Amino acid sequence: MKQTITHNKPRRAISYIRFSTPKQEHGFSLARQLQGTRDFCRRHNLVLDETLTIKDLGKSGFNGKNADSGNLSVFLDAIRNKKIPQNTVLVVEALDRLTRNNVIDASHLLTDILRHGIDVGLVTENKIYSKEYINNNPFEFIVATTYLIRGGDESRV
């Protein structure tokens, strides 16, 4: 009997790190997010491409500037132009690192990323959102939406 050996090639991961104020650069936010991403990638057998770490340091996610004119916007253009392979995982500490915009724009950002075949890994939740996962588990989208609402609400306070 012939035995077939399959190799599961680890998926590529790209880290997105953001904090809102330049003052936070002198704290532990950057180091915490980087270490969390590395640990997450180890747990999920992802290969972290540290040459493509996306950073919006001192850029608020509240009004969407990070997605409109920050380094996140460069990533979004790259996925729309198919320069980032599908099945890549964008790893963020939490959804509020990705955006703190209003819920409509925030959910649009998340679904835009997923629709382009890029999965979103959440360090704090230890889960990976994919288009397939969300479609098969629609209540997870409701959970994600509550995180997006909370992130926006925290910025408005």
Where are these regions (language model features)?
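Short, structured surface patches at the beginning of a domain
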Residues: 1-157
